[in-house]
């Protein structure tokens, strides 16, 4: 559910000669919700307290860094431009808003496709030109990816989290304190955790994971970016999606999906009383075990007794 809350940010944008914004970085403390907090007589340029050389031309001719101020009257409004999109993504990664609490419709059309390099963002068609410049300076240019979304950690490093492979977490991911993302875990924008969680599988756009839950190695959760689906999946607290398992329905609290078991919304599940239902009828129900009967091969669901899983506290003490 989107919020009508206003927001602001003062940041640095990388801009091409034809005024295309490649990225915008809003430093910690220079963005927030509500009105832009300037005192009378204060100029936006004074707020960032930039060191010499922070703005101006970059090594690649035609590329420059500029300071800009972005003010959003409502996070429910459509995205206006790239600077607007980056502010919304920063608000998520700074944990100022939660996934699905702001309007991100059409974001792909507002972001440029960028080569993310060790020398900063670059138009993909000019990578070789930048490579020559870097080699002339005695540096080797590394290309981290060519995409519309950069790595979150190049812009925001949230407190209290561990991320084993920074390439696996996009800007706009929401990682609550106590979250651990292992090497094979992946977190997309407008997705993430609401409490201490173990992420060894994939959390796709729009999906949120409750406190104390575990997404096992190779596990996946169906999202809305492909296939035409509109329902956003939520995993409750103290739930486990086992290794190489997956879900296309929401899980309530204290649920377990057996390793290797994939439950789509239309999957037929046999209940303990013999009834057969579609999985969507159990979406969001607490205290269930989903598993595949190794004798019949059929998918089954049955109530679980007691509370859900318990994470290893030592793995989530990340401060």
UniProtKB/Swiss-Prot annotation:
The active site is at 200 (acyl-anhydride intermediate). Pathway: Amino-acid biosynthesis; L-lysine biosynthesis via DAP pathway; LL-2,6-diaminopimelate from (S)-tetrahydrodipicolinate (succinylase route): step 1/3. It catalyses: (S)-2,3,4,5-tetrahydrodipicolinate + succinyl-CoA + H2O = (S)-2-succinylamino-6-oxoheptanedioate + CoA. GO terms for biological process: diaminopimelate biosynthetic process; lysine biosynthetic process via diaminopimelate. GO terms for cellular component: cytoplasm. Its EC number is 2.3.1.117. It is found in: Cytoplasm. Mg(2+) 2 binds at residue 184. The keyword Transferase applies. NCBIfam families: DapD_actino (TIGR03535). Homotrimer. Catalyzes the conversion of the cyclic tetrahydrodipicolinate (THDP) into the acyclic N-succinyl-L-2-amino-6-oxopimelate using succinyl-CoA. This is 2,3,4,5-tetrahydropyridine-2,6-dicarboxylate N-succinyltransferase. It comes from Salinispora tropica (strain ATCC BAA-916 / DSM 44818 / JCM 13857 / NBRC 105044 / CNB-440).
């Amino acid at each position: 559910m989107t919020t009508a809350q206003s927001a602001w940010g003062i940041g640095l944008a990388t801009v091409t000669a034809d005024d295309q914004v490649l990225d915008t970085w809003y430093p910690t403390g220079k963005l927030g919700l509500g009105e832009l907090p300037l005192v009378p007589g204060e100029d936006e340029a004074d707020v960032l307290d930039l060191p010499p050389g922070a703005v101006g031309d970059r090594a690649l001719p035609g590329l420059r860094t500029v300071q800009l101020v972005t003010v959003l009257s409502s996070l429910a409004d459509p995205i206006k431009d790239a600077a607007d999109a980056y502010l919304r993504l920063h608000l998520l990664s700074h944990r100022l808003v939660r996934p699905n609490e702001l309007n991100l419709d059409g974001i792909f059309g507002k972001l440029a496709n960028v080569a993310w390099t060790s020398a900063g963002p670059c138009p993909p068609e000019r990578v070789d030109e930048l490579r020559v410049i870097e080699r002339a300076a005695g540096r080797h240019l590394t290309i981290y990816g060519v995409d519309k979304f950069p790595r979150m950690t190049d812009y925001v490093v949230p407190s209290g989290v561990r991320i084993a492979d920074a390439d696996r977490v996009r800007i706009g991911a929401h990682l609550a304190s106590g979250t651990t993302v292992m090497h094979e875990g992946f977190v997309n924008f407008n997705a993430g955790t609401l409490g201490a969680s173990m992420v060894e599988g994939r959390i796709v756009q729009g999906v949120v994971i409750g406190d104390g839950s575990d997404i096992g190695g190779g596990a996946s959760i169906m999202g809305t970016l492909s296939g035409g689906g509109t329902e956003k999946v939520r995993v409750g607290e103290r739930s486990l999606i086992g290794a190489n398992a997956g879900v296309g329905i929401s899980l309530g609290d204290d649920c377990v999906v057996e390793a290797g078991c994939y439950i789509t919304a239309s999957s037929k599940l046999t209940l303990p009383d013999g009834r057969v239902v579609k999985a969507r009828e159990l979406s969001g129900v607490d205290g269930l075990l989903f598993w595949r009967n190794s004798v019949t091969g059929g998918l089954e669901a049955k109530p679980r007794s007691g509370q859900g899983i318990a994470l290893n506290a030592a793995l989530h003490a990340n401060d």
